[in-house]
Amino acid sequence: VALINNQFLPYPYYAKPGAVRSPAQILQWQVLPNTVPAKFCQPQPTTMARHPHPRLSFMAIPPKKNQDKTDIPSINTIATAESTITPTTEAIVDTVATQEASSEVIESAPEAKTDQVTSTVV
């Protein structure tokens, strides 16, 4: 296999020697009668005419695709969804009933205590 570098080819070809036709098909001769006008009275010899067959001495084979391809890094165009931390404020109400150590009956309502808690939700 021979490498063919030509300035007119976009990429190099590798030549692989080989015949397109078999040798029996290449040499095909056919006997044709001579078409000389009849005014000449001498006998005319028959002529041998060869039908032209194109013969290639080699075949041009393009290189494998992985030889002429440069490594192009793949770019991911789909943006990955990153989780954003969003602070949320929730009110937590604790209801505490206080009892005092006394014999008095307390008729007051239980105390309400409100704390603000900030949590991060992912």
From Swiss-Prot:
It is found in: Secreted. Keywords: Glycoprotein, Milk protein, Phosphoprotein, Secreted. It comes from the Eukaryota. The modification Phosphoserine is found at S102, S119. Glycans are attached at T84, T86, T89, T95, S102, T118. The keyword Phosphoprotein applies. The modification Phosphothreonine is found at T98. Pfam families: Casein_kappa. This is Kappa-casein. It comes from Elaphurus davidianus.
